[in-house]
């Protein structure tokens, strides 16, 4: 009798804990309202819906070895995963999924995303920030003949150039605007630019004849050059050639500007020659925030840590009246003139960029740079209407399956079937609680796994009931028939459940996305099914026997 009470208490305690785990709770989420992210308090059921149930975007990312050779991909992806997860958390996506798939890929699932291109850019952007002084020694002019010679030898001409690379077709800016971008990037320590807004006349080529000497023209600040849009593909291709990279003057690097430039009907690109050693990098940033400057428009204000502020002030103090390029992912965003030393606080001007672009840049800077460049191996966009349709069909399938099971069990096994149905209800609650406890994401394949586990839970009861029937047919008492029925069916139940759980573990380990969702739900359902079949259903029989002492028959 005491043992029976403990059984009942355990079942009741687990049921109460499961209901508590599934009860809607108050959470604080970062949500977007009228284009601005704010923190809001909402109530949510702890079960997360996957992309196929609410729509969104699925990304598969892998290391881009064309940009950087990585010795240990798995370790690099572990570090990249932390950065991507932090970016997604700040992006304001509710219930995202960021996980590794094997040792070479990252899976990112963003439910409810309506701007897929923007989300992909935030996830994939390397966000490596550098502050570098522009060249004052005319180093490029000294090697232009050598560059021309190499380009001619390799057959690189304007006619042979290809279309501009993706990501280099940014917004257009007037040449006059770019060449007069000398306003300082720091609120607390710099003054206005030394140039004026007067019309700019592009100077004649440095030399004549070759690819570089014909198409590379000096700008109005040291280290800046202007390249016609028509020559950009060829120049970019040439600058990636190993021989030209080797001929770059020691201690210098060549970087393109972010914007495409306009002068009348002509379009140009800005090219910069910079000191290779950066003054500081984004590693010393402690904060970055979007803001609106009355002069510069939308900007990103940043704050440095103590070491970064000390180094920045010292280095910028050495380069007063020089130009300092702010370089993001090897593209020059702006190159203001330093009118005085800069301390802890500063800002990055975006040259007419939108508030949203300022928000995104601040977000990725706060999260930090990716340790390795990533490329998109696969992208899938799932509409919200498709997700809603999946929910209705999935719930319908689950409801029909449950109804048929309940009716068949009650009709075929009568009173024993009723006990099995009650145990099945507890099984459903336990399974959902397990999924909520492990923060599992419910997907359409997951619902299929749920239905399959229901079938296996019912099958376990069928095995037990048939064994009990056999024992009763052999003339054994009701109590003995129940005990023997459970004992003889136990081995088969454990064997089949264990084999299926192992299969689910293999699917989870080597599968991705939907396959993992199926595996998680299947495993959770089988664990709950084992408990309810072996322990809960047996307890119900014991309660019935205790209240019906002397009963010689069993409705089964």
UniProtKB/Swiss-Prot annotation:
It is found in: Cell inner membrane. It comes from the Bacteria. Gene3D superfamilies: 3.30.1360.200, 3.30.70.3220, Multidrug efflux transporter AcrB transmembrane domain. It is a multi-pass membrane protein. Keywords: Cell inner membrane, Cell membrane, Membrane, Protein transport, Translocation, Transmembrane, Transmembrane helix, Transport. The chain crosses the membrane at residues 8-28, 391-411, 418-438, 445-465, 488-508, 517-537. Its main location: membrane. SUPFAM superfamilies: Multidrug efflux transporter AcrB transmembrane domain. InterPro entries: SecD, SecD/SecF_arch_bac, SecD/SecF_bac, SecD/SecF_CS, SecD_1st, SecD_SecF_C, SecD_SecF_C_bact, SecDF_P1_head. It holds the Pfam family Sec_GG. One of its GO terms (molecular function) is protein-transporting ATPase activity. GO terms for cellular component: plasma membrane. GO terms for biological process: intracellular protein transmembrane transport; protein targeting; protein transport by the Sec complex. Forms a complex with SecF. Part of the essential Sec protein translocation apparatus which comprises SecA, SecYEG and auxiliary proteins SecDF. Other proteins may also be involved. Part of the Sec protein translocase complex. Interacts with the SecYEG preprotein conducting channel. SecDF uses the proton motive force (PMF) to complete protein translocation after the ATP-dependent function of SecA. Belongs to the SecD/SecF family. SecD subfamily. This is Protein translocase subunit SecD. It comes from Gemmatimonas aurantiaca (strain DSM 14586 / JCM 11422 / NBRC 100505 / T-27).
């Amino acid at each position: 009798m005491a043992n029976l009470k403990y059984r009942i208490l355990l079942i009741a305690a687990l049921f109460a804990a499961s209901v508590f785990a599934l009860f809607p709770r108050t959470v604080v989420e970062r949500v977007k309202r009228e284009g601005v992210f704010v923190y809001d308090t909402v109530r949510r059921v702890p079960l997360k819906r996957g992309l196929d149930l609410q729509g969104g975007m699925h990304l598969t990312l892998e290391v881009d070895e064309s940009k950087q050779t990585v010795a240990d991909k798995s370790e690099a992806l572990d570090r990249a995963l932390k950065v991507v997860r932090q970016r997604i958390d700040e992006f304001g996506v509710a219930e995202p999924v960021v996980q590794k798939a094997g040792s070479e890929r990252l899976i990112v699932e963003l439910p409810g995303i309506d701007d897929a291109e923007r989300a992909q850019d935030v996830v994939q952007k390397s966000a490596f920030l550098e502050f570098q002084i522009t060249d004052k020694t005319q180093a490029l002019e000294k090697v232009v003949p050598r560059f021309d010679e190499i380009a001619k030898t390799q057959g690189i001409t304007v006619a042979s150039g290809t279309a501009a690379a993706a990501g280099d077709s940014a917004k257009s800016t007037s040449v006059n605007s770019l060449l007069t971008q000398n306003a300082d990037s720091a609120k607390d320590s710099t003054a206005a630019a030394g140039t004026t807004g007067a019309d700019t006349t592009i100077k004649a080529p440095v030399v004549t004849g070759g690819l570089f000497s014909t198409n590379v023209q000096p700008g109005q600040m040291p280290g800046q050059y202007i390249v016609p849009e028509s020559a950009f593909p060829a120049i970019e291709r040439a600058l990636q050639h190993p021989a030209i990279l080797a001929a770059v003057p020691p201690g210098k690097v060549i970087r393109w500007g972010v914007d495409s430039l306009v002068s009348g009907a002509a379009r140009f690109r800005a090219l910069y020659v910079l000191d290779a050693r950066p003054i500081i990098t984004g590693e010393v940033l402690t904060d970055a925030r979007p803001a609106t400057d009355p002069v510069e428009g939308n900007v990103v204000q940043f704050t440095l840590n103590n070491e970064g502020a000390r180094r920045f002030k010292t280095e910028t103090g050495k380069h007063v009246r020089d130009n300092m390029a702010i370089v993001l992912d090897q593209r020059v965003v702006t190159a203001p003139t330093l009118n005085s030393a800069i301390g802890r606080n500063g800002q990055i001007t975006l040259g007419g960029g939108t508030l949203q672009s300022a928000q995104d840049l601040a977000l990725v800077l706060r999260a930090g740079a990716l340790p390795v460049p990533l490329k998109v191996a696969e992208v899938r966009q799932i509409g919200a209407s498709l997700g809603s349709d999946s929910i209705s069909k999935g719930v319908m399938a689950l409801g029909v399956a449950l109804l048929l099971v309940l009716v068949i069990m009650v009709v075929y096994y009568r009173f024993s079937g009723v006990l099995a149905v009650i145990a099945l209800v507890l099984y459903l609650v336990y399974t959902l609680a397990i999924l909520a406890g492990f923060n599992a994401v419910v997907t359409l394949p997951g619902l299929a796994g749920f239905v399959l586990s229901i079938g296996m839970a019912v099958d376990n009861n069928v095995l037990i009931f048939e064994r009990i029937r056999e024992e009763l047919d052999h003339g054994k008492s009701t109590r003995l028939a129940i005990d023997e029925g459970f004992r003889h069916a136990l081995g088969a139940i454990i064997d089949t459940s264990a084999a299926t759980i192992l299969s689910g573990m293999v699917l989870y380990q080597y599968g991705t996305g939907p396959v993992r969702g199926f595996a998680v739900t299947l495993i959770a359902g089988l664990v709950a099914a084992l408990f309810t079949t072996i322990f809960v259903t047996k307890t119900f029989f014991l309660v019935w026997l205790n209240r019906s002492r002397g009963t010689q028959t069993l409705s089964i």
